[in-house]
């Protein structure tokens, strides 16, 4: 028979792992809802407030508010991803919950953006041709399809913090980061970002507010990709440097090496 203190310890460990797993699943569910809302927010379908809806304020103030919201997301999203922040942050939370908490934080900032975004309804372009309109709508959904596929080509559930808690639950030792470049990653180094760029720009009805979102988001993606690549070079070394030389970041290189 197990001593009471050992039984209590096992129950405590079991409860902690279960709580961590449930927490990561809740964060993942919130991410799914946020991602779906982002799609509706940009497309103007199925959401109570989209990128072009709302009472509106003077355009200079709207530009300022929207720029602050994008900057806030950029600061949170890139700041919490840096190694120095992670080292500090993991003094307060378990390593297995770090990624799920990062995902939750990003979703909360995005939710704030949805609520506070100020529309600028001035039309930039309006495609009335059925063919042109259909093409842009198809590109919009293609972009989101690329985003989803790109996450599964690497490790979807690890990217969003579920695998870490599931490994802890199953008592699996976390795998060391290893370089891999499946399918789309042989064409460009960041297909996930390519998908976002397509989705952000592909619309038959571009307003000034949507254009501002696309421009600021594109700027952040370029900056964020640069910061991410610095971390990847630090962790993977020459392997990733070789990959950088062979494969374009967002656009395929003309004489790109195949079969990596």
Swiss-Prot record:
Write the record's keywords in alphabetical order, separated by commas.
Membrane, Methyltransferase, S-adenosyl-L-methionine, Transferase, Transmembrane, Transmembrane helix
Reaction it catalyzes: methanethiol + S-adenosyl-L-methionine = dimethyl sulfide + S-adenosyl-L-homocysteine + H(+)
The GO terms this record gives for MF are:
methyltransferase activity
User: Which residues span the membrane?
Assistant: 27-47, 55-75, 107-127, 134-154, 196-216
Task: Report the subcellular localization.
Answer: Membrane
Q: What is its EC number?
A: 2.1.1.334
GO CC list: membrane
For membrane topology, the record states:
Multi-pass membrane protein
Task: List the disulfide bonds in this chain.
Answer: none
* The keyword NADP belongs to this UniProt entry's keyword annotation: no
Which family is this sequence assigned to?
Belongs to the nurim family.
Give the protein name, as stated in the record: Methanethiol S-methyltransferase
Source species: Pseudomonas sp. (strain GM41(2012))
Q: Which gene encodes it?
A: mddA
């Amino acid at each position: 028979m197990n001593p009471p203190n050992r039984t209590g310890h096992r129950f405590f460990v079991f409860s902690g792992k279960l709580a961590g797993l449930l927490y990561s699943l809740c964060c993942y569910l919130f991410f799914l809802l946020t991602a779906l809302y982002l799609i509706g927010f940009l497309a103007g379908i199925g959401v109570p407030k989209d990128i072009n809806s709302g009472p509106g304020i003077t355009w200079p103030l709207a530009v300022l508010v929207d720029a602050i919201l994008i900057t806030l997301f950029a600061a949170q999203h890139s700041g919490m991803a840096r190694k120095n922040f992670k080292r500090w942050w993991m003094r307060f939370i378990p390593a297995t919950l770090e990624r799920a908490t990062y995902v939750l934080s990003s979703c909360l900032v995005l939710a704030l953006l949805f609520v506070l975004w100020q529309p600028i309804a001035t039309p930039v372009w309006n495609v009335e041709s059925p063919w042109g309109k259909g093409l842009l709508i198809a590109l919009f959904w293609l972009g989101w399809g690329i985003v989803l596929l790109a996450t599964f080509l690497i490790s979807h559930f690890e990217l969003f913090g579920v695998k870490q808690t599931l490994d802890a639950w199953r008592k699996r030792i976390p795998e060391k980061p290893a370089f891999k470049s499946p399918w789309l990653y042989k064409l460009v180094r960041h297909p996930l970002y390519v998908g976002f760029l397509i989705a952000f720009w592909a619309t038959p009805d571009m307003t000034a507010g949507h254009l501002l979102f696309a421009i600021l988001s594109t700027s952040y993606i370029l900056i964020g990709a640069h910061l991410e690549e610095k971390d990847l070079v630090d962790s993977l070394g020459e392997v990733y440097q070789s990959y950088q030389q062979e494969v374009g970041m967002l656009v395929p290189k003309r004489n790109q090496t195949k079969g990596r």
